[in-house]
Amino acid sequence: MLKIKCLNPQLINALAHCGHGDKILICDGNYPIDSCTSETTEKIYLQLTHGIPTVTDVLKVLIESINVEKAQVMTPGEGQEPEIFKEFRGIINNKVELDELGRFEFYDESKKSNNIRLAIATGEKRTFANILLTVGVA
């Protein structure tokens, strides 16, 4: 039996193939994962039902499996910061700043970037609950 938190074989395999500078997208249930990622991006569909798992559930497991060098989030534009951003900061222990990208800039980054190795779809219902992680060195 594995002694790590991540037990999903497809996810473990994908993480093992990530290298420095590769990116991992964890997206909410509203994110157009098929049309806003490249054909070379491995996609894992973890959503079981509405709200399960959440983006933060997945982030908590990943953060113990990889080093994160950079984190980017999708902002709704002007107005209040989404509450989930505070949760993101708490989970990553403020080790890296959350770089904010506008909605369409985030989509473009996800679609055009050839180094997005993995995209994980969740059942998250909160809006703007998407985070793009850049894998750091060990």
What does each model-found stretch correspond to?
Residues M1-L48:
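Long, hydrophobic N-terminal alpha-helical segment
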Residues L2, C6-Q10, G19, H50-D57, ...:
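Conserved active-site and cofactor/substrate-binding residues in soluble primary-metabolism enzymes
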Residues D22-L25, E42-I44, E69-E78, V96-D99, ...:
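Structural motif
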Residues N30-S35, T40-E42, I63, F88-G90, ...:
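Short, solvent-exposed amphipathic alpha-helical segments in soluble enzyme
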Residues C36, T40-K70:
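A phosphate-binding glycine/aspartate-rich beta-alpha loop in the early core of alpha/beta enzymes
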Residues Q80-A138:
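Glycine-rich, aromatic-bearing surface loops/beta-hairpins
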